[in-house]
């Protein structure tokens, strides 16, 4: 996949199985742009992105709409609707509510269902956002620095929850982080990026 950005030209190629892949590198190395291209929020200039047997993007011929990609995306700022309760944030647009109910119990936020985002803590917002991302039953989960705003205790809890959810649902996850320690704790593989290029693809022992 290639995409020309303001200061760099992004040029990367990698595959993901049912594992946690970490995109690691300095600011401006193209990490978030990669997630946005996979999610359909940005278009690569050339290249191919495929999820299982479904082609999401292929050069100029194919560009699958966001809503058809079956991808969950957790943004750095969580992007919760401030005027909606926790339950409405999670269940918005869903036909079946049973899975969302199950997830809320799994992540320990069922007691927050009638509260609004401004009434809950940063860790609770993070768990609400990740519940919303998984509630759509995605085939791939994208996480853009989801733990950066949390304190040390909340971050440690969120790490354990993510690993538990991955073991439970076994879907591929691509995680962006600036923390080497976080990358090594959570990742099965770390992709080191610099100036839009993949420098190293390193398994975590």
Q: For the regions a protein language model found, what residue spans apply to each?
A:
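Conserved H-loop
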Residues: 170-176
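Helical segment within the ABC ATPase nucleotide-binding domain
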Residues: 156-169
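ABC ATPase NBD coupling module
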Residues: 56-73
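Catalytic Walker B motif of ABC-type/P-loop ATPase nucleotide-binding domains
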Residues: 141-145
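Conserved ABC ATPase "signature" region
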Residues: 54-58, 97-113, 163-164
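Conserved ABC ATPase signature
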Residues: 116-120, 124-126
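A short, proline-enriched helix->beta-strand linker immediately N-terminal to the Walker B motif
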Residues: 135-139
């Amino acid at each position: 996949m290639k995409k020309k950005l303001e200061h760099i030209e992004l040029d990367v190629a990698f595959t993901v199985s049912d594992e946690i892949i970490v995109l690691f590198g300095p600011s401006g190395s193209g990490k978030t742009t990669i997630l946005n291209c996979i999610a359909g929020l940005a278009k690569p200039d050339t290249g191919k992105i495929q999820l299982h047997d479904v082609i999401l993007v292929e050069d100029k011929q194919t560009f699958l709409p966001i809503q058809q990609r079956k991808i969950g995306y957790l943004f750095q700022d969580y992007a919760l609707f401030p005027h909606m309760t926790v339950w409405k944030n999670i269940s918005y647009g869903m036909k079946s509510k049973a899975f969302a109910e199950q997830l809320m119990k799994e992540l320990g936020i069922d007691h927050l269902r009638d509260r609004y985002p401004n009434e809950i803590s940063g860790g609770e917002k993070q768990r609400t956002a990740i519940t919303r991302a998984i509630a759509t039953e995605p085939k791939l989960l994208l996480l853009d620095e989801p733990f950066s705003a949390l304190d040390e205790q909340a971050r440690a809890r969120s790490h354990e929850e993510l690993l538990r959810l991955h073991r439970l649902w076994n879907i591929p996850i691509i995680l962006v982080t600036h923390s080497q320690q976080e990358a090594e704790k959570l990742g099965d593989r770390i992709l080191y990026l610099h100036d839009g290029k993949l420098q190293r693809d390193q398994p975590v022992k």
